[in-house]
């Protein structure tokens, strides 16, 4: 799967009307939350969408959980295997039933969690609940099917490595991280993917350890009968009885000096330049995630002086931005530039560095900070036009922060960020000893 999370988390749109801005509760829809005795959290969100419902299952397992040497890529692999079937619904039957109702049905994997989602008619909701509960409880696949899908995952890697982004991510993470599992991508290390067909027994244990009710949150958004939904949920998910494994997460040691990494890209593309600093984990009880969300937009967002200078006026860069989003453990805040030519690299690097140092010196535009806060907070809410929009945003933030109301609480934290907090954060974390610089130079030198 392509990593769409940064785009989904950083949706920007015009501000909401003043009446909506005045709400104390920044999320406009009620969450009805119940935790079953087995630990499964079920969240229902009534939404005016006659005849339509979105169904999101968030499993808090991602590439972060892959701590065993030689066993990376399995969180993503299970995104594939979860569509294989069960004894009750053999391979292909679930797809046929889902398609017969007209559901859109898919999944995606991230560093920290995996999401399964379906969107379609309420008339098929009872059938969908039974199908989803069955595969989460009773997934079955034979070793030949496992081997076939493992080869498909290897093919997915080969497809992705033809683009610069995968190799850039691999090199950046492998340079910035020495111990933590964030040092590999969601796809996993290439050697581990090649060896995956021989790991059938391990795959079964991975499923048993992480696909558990106490590690899963379900969001149901749209037009449905709440009592009937909860009755079906309790009937089909109630017998699910596994418990999530305990994880001994390796701690990343502090970085003590600037690191660099370079890629010579064999084919024609534009040069790339990335600055990345280690920053704190996402949390709803501290301001770090909210500060970084605002800070990324402040430094390189489309309203930033840097964007105006480098992209619009001097045209040294095709694009500047950041794909920052919060992580469960300390990760990276990055600034990314796609250069129009290799000759522009020094000037772009100098401009990015200057902007960071100016902020750390105390120079901050309070009015622009406030505008960015409004755009992040209300712009995202303006995009909640359909049950599927609501479901995906709730799922993404719940996957990161581990609580159903994470989206609302994060947006509240964003609204509380003060300009001086950006300055203090830059002084503490955006320093050279904490920095990794990644450069990519294409074979043509970036000349198009």
Where are the predicted features?
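M16 family metallopeptidases and their MPP-like homologs
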Residues: 45, 49-69, 73-77, 91-136, ...
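Bacterial N-terminal signal peptides
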Residues: 5-15
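His/Glu-based metal-binding/catalytic segments typifying zinc-dependent metallopeptidases
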Residues: 58, 158, 245-305, 397
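Proteolytic maturation boundary segments
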Residues: 17-44, 225-265, 272, 276-278, ...
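Short, polar/flexible loop-turn hinges at active-site or ligand-entry regions and domain interfaces
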Residues: 84-89, 136-144, 364-365
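N-terminal secretory signal peptides that target proteins for export/translocation
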Residues: 1-2
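N-terminal post-signal-peptidase region of extra-cytosolic proteins
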Residues: 27-29, 57-62, 204
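Non-catalytic, conformational "gating/processing" segments within enzyme and secreted inhibitor domains
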Residues: 150, 165, 202-236, 434-435
